Regions:
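Active-site-adjacent loop/helix surface patches within enzyme catalytic domains
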Residues: 2-131
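Acidic/histidine-rich, metal-coordinating catalytic segments
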Residues: 129-145
């Protein structure tokens, strides 16, 4: 799928999401994670395997390709039992993005330039589409409990 922004998304659906569809107005946050796994293929498999009980809306590969795993209007399972201020269960109100990176456990590496360019385009698109307020943009590990 090609968006008006020039962003190209590949479909690779995960079955890990909650029904029913949510209103576009419910989406208030974007939460970005890194995978923390050595192999990109293992991270993607985990995000799409039912037994893992984890998913995200988008997955950004090392080469910058963006995979759309869960449609935006469904609740992906990326934030766990989370809260921020007086809001519980951030999965209900957020878009989750996973960027492939082995993380600190496996020799943390800088994100590729292609990943950085892709996340910038994707964020711009999502922020405009869902009117995400600047004060509701944060890094998941720092502000969520």
């Amino acid at each position: 799928m090609s968006l008006k922004t020039g962003l190209k998304l590949a479909k690779n659906y995960s079955i890990n999401f909650s029904l029913p569809k949510r209103s576009k107005r419910k989406i208030k946050f974007i939460i970005i994670h890194y995978t923390g796994m050595k192999k990109e293929s293992n991270a993607l498999r985990k995000l799409c395997h039912y037994n893992s009980k984890v998913s995200s809306h988008y997955f950004i590969k090392k080469d910058g390709e963006i995979l759309n795993l869960v449609p935006d209007l469904y609740q992906a399972w990326h934030a766990g039992k989370s809260s921020w201020k007086n809001i519980k269960s951030l999965n209900r109100y957020s878009i989750g993005i996973e960027i492939h990176n082995p993380g600190h456990q496996h020799g943390y590496k800088s994100f590729s330039l292609k990943q950085i360019n892709s996340i910038k385009k994707l964020l711009k698109y999502l922020i405009n589409k869902y009117k995400i307020q600047k004060k509701k943009r944060f890094r998941s590990f720092r502000y969520c409990s």
